């Protein structure tokens, strides 16, 4: 139980190769995740600004009934 078999080492080797092998796959994955999070936050920010713009519009001035007569 204290020693690792060849299968344990093979699995560890595959995981390490997937994470750190090639052209910086881990950094590429993390960069894509960061871009996704940033886009999500920007989307939420845009929706809240749009909602504020809709609620912040001034109401048109209504004419008094007396001044409309002339």
UniProtKB/Swiss-Prot annotation:
PANTHER family: SEC-INDEPENDENT PROTEIN TRANSLOCASE PROTEIN TATA (PTHR42982:SF1). The keyword Transport applies. GO terms for cellular component: TAT protein transport complex. The Tat system comprises two distinct complexes: a TatABC complex, containing multiple copies of TatA, TatB and TatC subunits, and a separate TatA complex, containing only TatA subunits. Substrates initially bind to the TatABC complex, which probably triggers association of the separate TatA complex to form the active translocon. GO terms for biological process: protein transport by the Tat complex. Signal peptide: none annotated. It is a single-pass membrane protein. Belongs to the TatA/E family. The gene is tatA. It is found in: Cell inner membrane. This is Sec-independent protein translocase protein TatA. GO terms for molecular function: protein transmembrane transporter activity. The chain crosses the membrane at residues 1-21. Pfam families: TatA_B_E (PF02416). Residues 45-70 are annotated as: Disordered. InterPro entries: TatA/B/E, TatA/E. Part of the twin-arginine translocation (Tat) system that transports large folded proteins containing a characteristic twin-arginine motif in their signal peptide across membranes. TatA could form the protein-conducting channel of the Tat system.
């Amino acid at each position: 139980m204290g020693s690792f078999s060849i299968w344990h080492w093979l699995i560890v080797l595959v995981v390490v190769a997937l994470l750190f092998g090639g052209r910086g796959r881990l950094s590429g994955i993390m960069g894509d995740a960061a871009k996704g999070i940033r886009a999500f936050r920007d989307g939420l920010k845009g929706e809240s600004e749009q909602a504020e713009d809709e609620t912040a519009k001034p109401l048109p001035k209504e004419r008094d009934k007396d001044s409309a007569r002339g």
